[in-house]
Amino acid sequence: SKNIAIPLNKGLLLEVLGEEPITAATKRIELRIRGEKDFNPMAELDIESLRFGSYEEVNFGRGCKPLRTRVEGDDLIVTFKGKGSGITPDEWAPKLIGRTKQGEMVFGYASLPYVDYRPAILSARRPWYDKEANAVKVSVENFGLSASKPAEIAVTIDGKPIGTTTIGALAPYARTTATLSQATLEQGTCEVTATVDGQLTVLGKFTL
C-alpha cells in the first residue's frame, strides 16, 4: 500500500532582504512575504502574531517581533526587531510562524541572501597508479548544481603527502581526472582533499 500526504498548509514564500549576515548584533531584519494568487499577506495576516528567527526560538514562542510593514506590489515587507532571532552563522533557513486574522496558523522558511543554496559539490573516487605515466590519478566529479571553482587536489597516505595538482572549473555533474606526476601509491589510509579559495575540503578517504 502507499500513503499519499497532501499538506493542508503549504507554507509562505519568504525571503530575507539585505546582504549582511544576521548576527546577535543585528538590530533590524527585513522579511519579504510574497503575495500569491490566493493570498494577500497585508490583508490576511495578523501582523502582531508573527515571530521570526531560528526554529529553535520560534517553535517555543520566542523569536523576533514585528516593528513595521510596507507593501511592495503584491508582497508585504515586514521589519522585525533583530533581538532574539537565535540565527547563527550556519543557519540555513530561518522560520516564520504566526496567524491569519481568522486565527489559522501560518508558517514558512525564508531564504537568506548570503547562503548558497546551489553549491558545487566535489567528490573523488579511489586514486589509482598509472604505470605508463608514472603518475597517481584520481577522478574528481562535481555533483553540485553550480559550476565549481578551480581547485588544488592533494593526495596523502597516512598523513604523508603524495602529491598535488590543480584542476579547472567543473560544470555541474562534470568529471575530470587529476594527474599527480612522479607519484606512487602504497598501502595505508588514503585521503583526497581539495583546496578552493583557501578552504580545504576532504573529498574522500580510502583504504589502499
Give a label for each model feature.
Residues 52-54, 155-157:
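Conserved aromatic beta-strand anchor motif in extracellular beta-sandwich/beta-rich domains
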Residues 70-81, 172-179:
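Aromatic sugar-binding surface patches on proteins
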Residues 160-187:
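Intrinsically disordered, low-complexity Pro/Gly/Ser/Thr-rich segments with frequent PxxP/GP/PP motifs
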Residues 184-208:
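Terminal connector regions
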Residues 83-90, 183-188:
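Surface-exposed, short loops/turns at beta-strand junctions within beta-sandwich domains
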Residues 140-145:
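Asparagine-centered strand-capping/turn motif at beta-strand->loop junctions
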Residues 2-4, 105-113, 200-208:
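Edge beta-strands of extracellular beta-sandwich domains
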Residues 20-26, 126-133:
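Short, solvent-exposed loop/linker segments at the N-terminal edge
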